[in-house]
Amino acid sequence: MKDGRILTEEDYAKDYSVPVPDELLHTVHVGEVTKEKIRLSCDGKTDVIQMNPHQIVTTHLVEEVPTENGYFKSDGVYNKICVVERHGKTGEIGVAPLKGFGVKGGAVATSVAHDSHNLIVAGDNDEDILAAIKGVEENQGGYVIASGGKVVDVLPLPICGLMSEK
């Protein structure tokens, strides 16, 4: 249906696209994110986010996690997850150990994150986490995979950081 009328096969061949307003194409503003900003100091037990297979619901755990020089260090069991405020308002970054994700040698980031649509990234090392964050910002949203300190794949979603122009 378009304009109250049922569409025919011929109608589907028509281009119904409309220009996207510029302000909807520039909505990812994370500012400078550094290793220092995503470090998580911990000594002893700390809060952990446990992923549950095939579920959107997570579980809160308190566990002893691996550390190096007083900071959390990812290993084969625990990855790091960061939530980065991406609307350019507060610059807040939340960091926690994530159990059950299992990424090795990389990071995955996205700007599609209901309810706030902030940038979420999970990975096993800071270089890839930072590269993935930068990749999402450079593409003004979407999904990014980083490995070896660089972006290796991207699905750009530049309309409000949530939708494709195509």
Feature locations, PLM:
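Active-site microenvironment of metallo-dependent hydrolases
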Residues: 1-166
